[in-house]
Amino acid sequence: MCSISFINLISISLTCFLLSLYYLLNNMVYFIEWEVVSLNSMSIVMTFLFDWMSLLFMSFVLMIASLVIFYSKEYMESDENINRFIMLVLMFVLSMMLLIISPNLVSILLGWDGLGLVSYCLVIYFQNIKSYNAGMLTALSNRIGDVALLLAIAWMLNYGSWNYIFYLEVMQNEFSMLMIGSLVMLAAMTKSAQIPFSSWLPAAMAAPTPVSALVHSSTLVTAGVYLLIRFNIVLSTSWLGQLLLLLSGLTMFMAGLGANFEFDLKKIIALSTLSQLGLMMSILSMGFYKLAMFHLLTHALFKALLFMCAGAIIHNMNNSQDIRLMGGLSIHMPLTSACFNVSNLALCGMPFLAGFYSKDMILEIVSISNINMFSFFLYFFSTGLTVSYSFRLVYYSMTGDLNCGSLNMLNDESWVMLRGMLGLLFMSIIGGSMLNWLIFPFPYMICLPGYLKMLTLFVCIVGGLFGYLISISNLYSLNKSLLNYNLTLFLGSMWFMPYISTYGMIFYPLNYGQLVVKSFDQGWSEYFGGQHLYYKLSNYSKTLFLMHNNSLKIYLMLFVFWIMILFSFLLFL
């Protein structure tokens, strides 16, 4: 089943890519209307939008999904339910495709809810308590976005149609469109895990690693970014863009800090995804939707590769994800290590890899844009933190000696897994330049002073040195961090967001409810009122019932007892 799915998906992906090139070069957009039901004067019509953006994004989703399924053939080989796993992944991709090609909020909701439902099934695929909790957190966080999307659909009834694409430019300054835009932004923030809905994304790492490679590169988390790209006109002409810039910038900063304190391999990569999602959202909020789309596509390539390499490492390390137990993997697993390092360097923005073209352009656009000093600081400091945790990850996993048990035998994975990784390695190297020439065919003139041009390079070098220094001085930094335990805990636990959004949301209401129950429902009024009366009467009834059902000797004893009382009464008279 893996091979058939791989061939079908890669064929459709290639077709979509060629069509997107044709549409892009000829500046074409196709609307296809399918009349689902026609009864008297009533008809239900489903509309599909095909332009270069939807087709290109769909081709990337299908390509990554095909390689992930091919990779899963070996990774999930020992799993008895691998066919169920492949079916879930295909349902996930189908939901994403429906969301991509829909210009209608109702059909978008079908794909949106499909993503949420199937992601829950995939997160709880390994059946244990941790997976169940992570799945419930993922589902409930995304429910908020679903409700926001339903409210946006209800508000669009004012227009008589749910095809938002026709109203964006005409109604962009109206209050009703602002309300719809704010609800859609809330939905996108939950799906793309922006503050304050960030806690579900690292928790979703309980899913199998191939799912993480698909979910955190091109499908679930990027659905919110893609939806906001479609609604970019409403964001760029209102205060919603400024609010989104603040929240996404803080998300980027928070995720970068958290990743530098984390030791779980998959969680570090998940936090880096969160940081890059904040980068996409922030540049989108400034009105550069093509640039956000560009970074979304390049990020999909190297992040899927990074997760695949992490899966291969975890597979070899007997399912251990602690980077402190790794080391010297470049000697034992050279091909996997090469892919891992290339994807890490692409994440840092190494020149001429996929991430360089989009990240460098974003930082240069930020430098010439009219934004405040705080946002400027968040952009560049977060970039430095990205390089820092990437170098820290490479240091712990690739250098030195192996820190786990000496009986472990490490080697590169079989060619089935390596072929999937090498396909994405090729795209991570050439994908950035290819997309740059396609999406931005004409050169942009960005005039910057020398110190601003060199600022990006300086921030990356300082970030890399910082990551290396905190890695080699781990014992010293551990002792120092214990002196500032509360600060370390705050920075390393995503600013207490997992506690606030889970335990913190229910602790005080439940505690207050328990107090109310004890004070009123089970308090003194109940004790001296109905409950006490019921308790006394039931006790008396039980005693009488016991006496009534007992043997004959009790009746005789009572008879003798009453006769004695009667005689004593008569004697004293």
UniProtKB/Swiss-Prot annotation:
GO molecular function: NADH dehydrogenase (ubiquinone) activity
Catalytic reactions of this protein: a ubiquinone + NADH + 5 H(+)(in) = a ubiquinol + NAD(+) + 4 H(+)(out)
The keyword Secreted is assigned to this record: no
Class of this enzyme: translocase
Cross-referenced Pfam families: NADH5_C, Proton_antipo_M, Proton_antipo_N
Keywords: Electron transport, Membrane, Mitochondrion, Mitochondrion inner membrane, NAD, Respiratory chain, Translocase, Transmembrane, Transmembrane helix, Transport, Ubiquinone
GO biological process, one term: ATP synthesis coupled electron transport
One GO cellular component term: mitochondrial inner membrane
EC number: 7.1.1.2
Membrane-crossing segments per the record: 4-24, 44-64, 85-105, 106-126, 147-167, 170-190, 212-234, 239-259, 268-288, 294-314, 337-357, 377-396, 422-442, 452-472, 487-507, 552-572
Disulfide partners: none
Chief place where the protein resides: mitochondrion
InterPro entries in the cross-refs: NADH_DH_su5_C, ND/Mrp_TM, NU5C-like, Proton_antipo_N
Mode of membrane association: Multi-pass membrane protein
Compartments (UniProt record): Mitochondrion inner membrane
Function: Core subunit of the mitochondrial membrane respiratory chain NADH dehydrogenase (Complex I) that is believed to belong to the minimal assembly required for catalysis. Complex I functions in the transfer of electrons from NADH to the respiratory chain. The immediate electron acceptor for the enzyme is believed to be ubiquinone.
Family: Belongs to the complex I subunit 5 family.
Name used for this protein in its record: NADH-ubiquinone oxidoreductase chain 5
Species assigned in the record: Drosophila yakuba (Fruit fly)
Designated gene of the protein: mt:ND5
